[in-house]
A protein has these predicted regions:
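RNA-binding basic/glycine-rich loop and surface signature characteristic of RAMP-family CRISPR effectors
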Residues: 1-167
Length: 167
């Protein structure tokens, strides 16, 4: 079989794209370290996929009412398919089923993604820039102490790749 596809590599300028769990009052960017010790920030492919679906819904009315927790885990609804959801069509899915009287084996129904994304990786090294935040202006109004936060910042060019299976 001779598969056809389209690959796009995109470079864009952005700041502080994707935060992880954080520690205390510090919001940490998602980062990875290379073998040479350099640290780079990234936006996960899941974050990119989420935003594509969000923008698809906002601009093109994509149906995002396609998930439930009927079987104990959050997944795409059993009765829906790619005709009902652009997201399911482009990014694929796995619907699991438990063993039951009707379904002795249990198992899963899957569709491979037609669109695949890489992480968006910064092209410039992260240098531990922090932004110190406070709500002092609000706290002063009621004679209270301000709340403090530290937010990691990184302005950089980023790159990611999109691969689309055409047939």
């Amino acid at each position: 079989m001779n598969s056809k596809g389209l690959t796009l590599t995109i470079i864009f300028k952005a700041q502080s794209l994707n935060y992880g769990e954080g520690i205390g009052n510090i919001s940490e960017l998602k980062k990875l370290a290379r073998g040479n010790g350099n640290v780079y920030t990234f936006a996960s492919r899941q974050a990119l996929r989420y935003d594509i679906a969000r923008i698809g819904n906002k601009l093109y009315n994509w149906n995002l009412e396609v998930v439930d927790k009927e079987k104990g885990t959050i997944q795409f609804k059993d009765e829906l398919n790619i005709k009902d959801s652009q997201e399911m069509d482009l990014f694929g899915y796995m619907k699991t089923s438990k063993k039951s009287a009707e379904n002795e084996d249990g198992g899963s129904e899957t569709r491979s993604a037609a669109v695949r994304l890489s992480h968006a990786l910064s092209l410039e090294e992260y240098k531990s820039d922090m932004d110190f935040l406070t709500n002092k202006g609000l706290a002063d109004r009621i004679d209270e102490f301000p709340n403090l936060a530290n937010v990691e910042q990184h302005l950089s060019y980023y790159t990611y790749t999109v691969t689309v299976e055409l047939a």
